[in-house]
Amino acid sequence: GASEEEDVDLSDILAGVDEGDVEVSETVGSQEPVDLEAQAGESPVIRYVNYIIQQAVKEGASDIHIEPAEKKLKVRFRIDGMLFESMNPPAGMSAAIASRLKIMANLDISERRVPQDGRIRCTVAGRKLDLRVSTLPCGYGEKVVMRILDTRSIQVELDQLGFGTNTLEVWKAQVKNPHGIVLVTGPTGSGKTTTLYASLRVIDKNKLNISTVEDPVEYHMEGITQTQTHERIGMTFAKALKALLRQDPDVIMLGEIRDHETAHTAVQAALTGHLVLSTLHTNDAPSSVTRLVNIGLEPFLVGAALNGVLAQRLVRRLCEHCKCEEMPSEEMREYLGMQGLPCESMWVGKGCDRCRSTGYAGRLGIYELLAVDDQLRDVIARNPNVSEFRRMCLERGMTSLRQDGLKKASKGQTSIQEILRVTESSI
């Protein structure tokens, strides 16, 4: 990274950057993409912004943070869930870079006092990308954060996400059920959307009517009707869902269950012969049941409608080029022994040029799948205490997030340290 260097000489960097490298589909007045290359006499700012986006894509970043400080401007990329400082343009470019990004995202360039949100559609190295742009006024100007939505990353299949064979089979059966609710749960950025889209792909869209309600529609999928919510004009999740139910749907994907009205409508849909897939923000699978009851649903309805809950996290994958086995500490050996895992050696990433000296490259999912059977339906109907319910699920063979992660660490897919970092001891 450039974190140790002084302000860089732009002309050196920009020598190799062409205006056409990032082709922005500007939507000014019309939907016709405007090729930036055609706009002659480009200023260094335009080229530098192109350079930032290009570098981020090249390094596999999911987000770009442009952060003005008193005497410097920091550009950080989020790679595999971690932020890395990537470049330090001159502090004086802060306003110009923010303005350029606002123009690209069709935002109000003169408004610097309130946050703004927009989106940039562009092509980088032949790849079509969507950048979600968010600006925020702060002490030294405006901070700009961009989320890179790469349509390729969402085209992964279920069996590429890191599921164990058994979990994968059970989950596929869940999403092929003709009716009921199937949930994916986890914090923001844990890969829920990717799992939902991959799950929709195993359903036969030629024979079934599949519809989604999302906020916003992140990726467009062929053969599926996708609807975006607009809270400001009253197009809420609940309202969109009610409208969808009049469209003779078979499968409905809801971006998120946020409130009682949406939850209630989703349950009614599930109980009247529709399959509903959605997400929640809970730490583990069993606590999703409690969350639905807390939203205001009757426990017996939750028990009747719920088919399965998949809790997930993303963990960093060990770099294939520098991973190796080493002897665990005494304390770690004891811990591994208690978990019933091999304790003579453990996998670690040494760090090399290929992985920015982190020891990790790429990510995979760890999962906890709760499949609801008749016995559990009866338990849920009695509104169990959450820790008691969790204990019961584990006793009946549910693999916890941490157990799934430790299994993957013992196979050398990730490290034990990474699993302990991402999961809480209770899960």
Q: Which residues does each PLM region occupy?
A:
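Cytosolic catalytic headpiece of P-type ATPases
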Residues: 143-144, 265, 363-368
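NTP-binding/hydrolysis catalytic cores, primarily Walker-type P-loop NTPases
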Residues: 339-427
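Cys/His-rich Zn2+-binding cysteine-cluster or related metal-binding knuckle/ribbon modules and their
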Residues: 282-373
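Walker A (P-loop) phosphate-binding loop of P-loop NTPases
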Residues: 189
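The Walker A (P-loop) glycine that initiates the GxxxxGKT/S ATP-binding motif of P-loop NTPases
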Residues: 185-186
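Switch/coupling sub-region of P-loop NTPases
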Residues: 168, 172-182, 193-316
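N-terminal, intrinsically disordered, highly charged
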Residues: 1-142, 149-154, 158-159, 165-166, ...
